[in-house]
Swiss-Prot record:
Pathway: Amino-acid biosynthesis; L-lysine biosynthesis via DAP pathway; LL-2,6-diaminopimelate from (S)-tetrahydrodipicolinate (acetylase route): step 1/3. PANTHER family: 2,3,4,5-TETRAHYDROPYRIDINE-2,6-DICARBOXYLATE N-ACETYLTRANSFERASE, ACETYLTRANSFERASE. PROSITE patterns: HEXAPEP_TRANSFERASES. It comes from Caldanaerobacter subterraneus subsp. tengcongensis (strain DSM 15242 / JCM 11007 / NBRC 100824 / MB4) (Thermoanaerobacter tengcongensis). The keyword Repeat applies. Keywords: Acyltransferase, Amino-acid biosynthesis, Diaminopimelate biosynthesis, Lysine biosynthesis, Repeat, Transferase. Its EC number is 2.3.1.89. Pfam families: DapH_N (PF08503), Hexapep (PF00132), Hexapep_2 (PF14602). One of its GO terms (biological process) is lysine biosynthetic process via diaminopimelate. This is 2,3,4,5-tetrahydropyridine-2,6-dicarboxylate N-acetyltransferase. Belongs to the transferase hexapeptide repeat family. DapH subfamily. Signal peptide: none annotated.
Length: 241
């Protein structure tokens, strides 16, 4: 059995699927309770407040039990929750030397490099890696085990396919200094070479050579990256660090 408390070697679709299957499912909730309730400390339950007002934080079944036991003492209560039977917690981002904007969803077992930028609405799945100085723009999706190099821009709404469902033995790899336009899709197992540019809206189904520009559905090479392209696709360092 996988030890879910260690840094498991989640390098393929089947290991990740087993990790998810064996993980203890969680429905954490927060309850605001008005009333002089009787509640004792127990594992998995945090209690805050005063004599006639309590905030309870814990698993749904534990909090519901407290509310049911005190229903005659409760004037009213409000329950907050944002997930149900979740298998993977969110990443603890407090230690990261990166910019993480509100609304980004980053699951556990993700690696994020120094000065990376994760914008609002971006979703980064388990096992993904984001390199230094890279930006994951608004509503972009980085699938499970997706590998993003350094100084990469993944445009708004772009999708980097993961290794899960359909299972893939090879993750998507975006090498350093790549620019991916808005709403582009990079399919399973594709490698985008260093310095390449993927035009907005493209669907990339095969490897992209370094320093080339691809566009279209499916994406095809349209030219080699030149100075004009470099100027149009350069990163803004002021947005990082």
């Amino acid at each position: 059995m996988i030890n879910l408390n260690t840094n498991d070697n989640l390098t393929n679709a089947y290991e990740i699927a087993r990790y998810i299957k064996e993980a203890k499912k969680s429905t954490p909730v927060k309850a605001y309770v008005q009333g002089k309730i009787q509640v004792e400390e127990e594992e998995g339950l945090k209690i805050f407040g005063s004599e006639d007002f309590k905030i309870l934080i814990g698993e749904l079944e534990v909090v519901e039990k407290v509310i049911e036991q005190n229903k005659d003492r409760i004037k009213y209560y409000h329950l907050e929750y944002d997930r149900r039977n979740s298998a993977i917690p969110l990443l603890d981002i407090t230690h990261l030397d990166a910019r993480i904007e509100p609304g980004a969803i980053i699951r556990d077992k993700v690696k994020i490099g120094k000065n990376a930028v994760i914008m609002m609405g971006a979703v980064i799945n388990i096992g993904a890696e984001i390199g230094e100085n890279s930006m994951i723009d608004m509503n972009a999706v980085i699938g499970a085990r997706g590998i993003i190099g350094k100084n990469v821009h993944v445009g708004a709404g772009a999708v980097i396919a993961g290794v899960l469902e359909p299972p893939s033995s090879v993750p998507v790899v975006i090498e350093d200094n790549v620019m991916i336009g808005a709403n582009a899709v990079i399919l399973e197992g594709v490698r985008v070479g260093r310095g390449a540019v993927v035009a907005a809206g493209s669907v990339v189904i095969e490897d992209v050579p370094p320093n080339t520009v691809v566009a279209g559905v499916p994406a095809k090479i349209v030219k080699v990256v030149d100075e004009k392209t470099r100027e149009k696709t350069k990163l803004m360092e002021d947005l990082r660090g």
